[in-house]
């Protein structure tokens, strides 16, 4: 679809995901063993045959650039590209000051692409969405701007932009992260919230960005400034994400904000459920990513016992000897010695776990070496002296750590 340009906001610092974001940006954080968070946004575009995409980066972007270069390089195909663009301070010596400013500072690239519509999406949520369906809705309504939205429990809605709509789907109210969110009429326990995904008519977007950039009182953010200014005109519409249908998927849509350690851990546990609400296996909606050239995972018994793999994902290049792995995700090249007991844990890859270790509800970042006999997640009071422990008791081992030596 040559008239459509994708702009993916991938500059998030991800401070609430520390220590996983100490050395990488939030969109580059691994997920589900084989993927990075950025992959899910990119797949939503590519599987909808929308292949003119700029990815806007900012903080600690080297890991993200490396991943995209290896896994998402489609340059050379006429009128198709997926190009990362680092923050370049084109409008002055300053970083992006808000989501709208990030797009404004790259106005030149958009104008050169001559789009009719511009799709502006985030890159740090887990979901599948056929963007063409939202685009069709946008065109049908002859909207200047379309915002995708979903129902959210009222208790959680204050973290998002809260929307009011009329019977035709037109936005008639919007408040960014309100302390007292308004509920959906007739549905008092839920609010309608913005997913942070927008489709603009290109000429409207360009004009709004230029006007906003000249406004010294603006925070240069779509949720705080652009949307509240636009919706009273009557040409801003709201796309109901629950109506998005993907062949081979359940009717009930799945969307998770993984902006905290606890949410990130829970989204992984969702993958491991018998009837997982988010599937990695739909052939009609393949999840593309970079797959390193590694041998299959290997499982062997040992003198200390038989290997047991229960309700888990184990990636290529991994080696598990005579250990029990339950409800866990093991990333590439996870090396597990014998007599280990690992449950409800996430190993991001290139992790070595020595003989007789016990891991309970632990996230282990890359390049970690855990000494034989180490127990983590068993005594949280002791763990807190050394590691980050989340509100829900998830222990996080930082990248490159040597534990128990």
UniProtKB/Swiss-Prot annotation:
Enzyme class: transferase
One GO molecular-function entry: glucose-1-phosphate adenylyltransferase activity
Substrates-to-products reaction catalysed: alpha-D-glucose 1-phosphate + ATP + H(+) = ADP-alpha-D-glucose + diphosphate
Keyword line: ATP-binding, Carbohydrate metabolism, Glycogen biosynthesis, Glycogen metabolism, Nucleotide-binding, Nucleotidyltransferase, Transferase
GO biological process: glycogen biosynthetic process
Known EC number: 2.7.7.27
Coiled-coil intervals, chain numbering: none
Pathway noted in the entry: Glycan biosynthesis; glycogen biosynthesis
Binding site for alpha-D-glucose 1-phosphate: 96, 161, 176-177, 194
Subunit structure as annotated in this protein's UniProt entry: Homotetramer.
Family: Belongs to the bacterial/plant glucose-1-phosphate adenylyltransferase family.
PANTHER family: GLUCOSE-1-PHOSPHATE ADENYLYLTRANSFERASE, GLUCOSE-1-PHOSPHATE ADENYLYLTRANSFERASE-RELATED
Function: Involved in the biosynthesis of ADP-glucose, a building block required for the elongation reactions to produce glycogen. Catalyzes the reaction between ATP and alpha-D-glucose 1-phosphate (G1P) to produce pyrophosphate and ADP-Glc.
HAMAP family linked: GlgC
The protein's name: Glucose-1-phosphate adenylyltransferase 1
Source species taxonomy: Bacteria, Pseudomonadati, Pseudomonadota, Gammaproteobacteria, Vibrionales
Gene (name only): glgC1
């Amino acid at each position: 679809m040559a008239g459509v340009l994708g702009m993916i906001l991938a500059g998030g610092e991800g401070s609430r995901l520390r220590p996983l974001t100490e050395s990488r940006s939030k969109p580059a954080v691994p997920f589900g063993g084989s993927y990075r968070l950025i992959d899910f946004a990119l797949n939503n575009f590519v599987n909808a045959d929308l292949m003119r995409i700029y990815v806007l980066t900012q903080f600690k972007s080297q890991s993200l650039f490396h991943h995209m270069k290896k896994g998402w390089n489609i340059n050379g195909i006429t009128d198709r590209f997926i190009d990362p663009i680092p923050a370049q301070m084109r409008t002055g010596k300053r970083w992006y000051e808000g989501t709208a400013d990030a797009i404004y500072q790259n106005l030149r690239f958009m104008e050169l692409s001559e789009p009719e519509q511009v799709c502006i999406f985030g890159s740090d949520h887990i979901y599948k969405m056929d963007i063409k369906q939202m685009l069709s809705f946008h065109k049908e309504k002859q909207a200047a701007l379309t915002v995708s939205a979903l129902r959210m429990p009222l208790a959680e809605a204050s973290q998002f932009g809260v929307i009011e709509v009329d019977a035709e789907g037109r936005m008639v109210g919007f408040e960014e992260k309100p302390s007292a969110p308004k509920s959906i009429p007739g549905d008092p326990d839920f609010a309608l919230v913005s997913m942070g995904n927008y489709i603009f008519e290109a000429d409207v977007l360009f004009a709004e960005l230029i006007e906003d950039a000249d406004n010294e009182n603006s925070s240069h953010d779509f949720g705080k400034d652009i949307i509240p200014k636009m919706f009273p005109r009557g040409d801003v519409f709201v796309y109901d994400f629950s109506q998005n249908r993907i062949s081979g998927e359940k009717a009930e849509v799945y969307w998770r904000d993984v902006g905290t350690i606890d949410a990130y851990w829970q989204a992984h546990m969702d993958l491991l459920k018998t009837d997982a609400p988010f599937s990695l296996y739909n052939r009609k909606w393949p999840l593309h990513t970079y797959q390193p050239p590694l041998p299959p995972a290997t499982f062997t018994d040992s003198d200390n016992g038989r290997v047991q793999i229960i309700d888990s994902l184990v990636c290529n290049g991994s080696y598990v000897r005579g250990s029990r792995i339950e409800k866990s995700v093991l990333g590439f090249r996870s090396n597990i010695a014998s007599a280990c007991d690992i449950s409800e844990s996430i190993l991001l890859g290139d992790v070595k776990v020595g003989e007789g270790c016990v891991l309970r509800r632990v996230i282990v970042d890359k390049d970690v070496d855990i000494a034989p006999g180490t127990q983590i997640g068993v005594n949280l009071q002791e763990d807190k002296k050394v590691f980050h422990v989340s509100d829900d008791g998830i222990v996080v081992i930082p990248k490159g750590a040597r534990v128990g030596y």
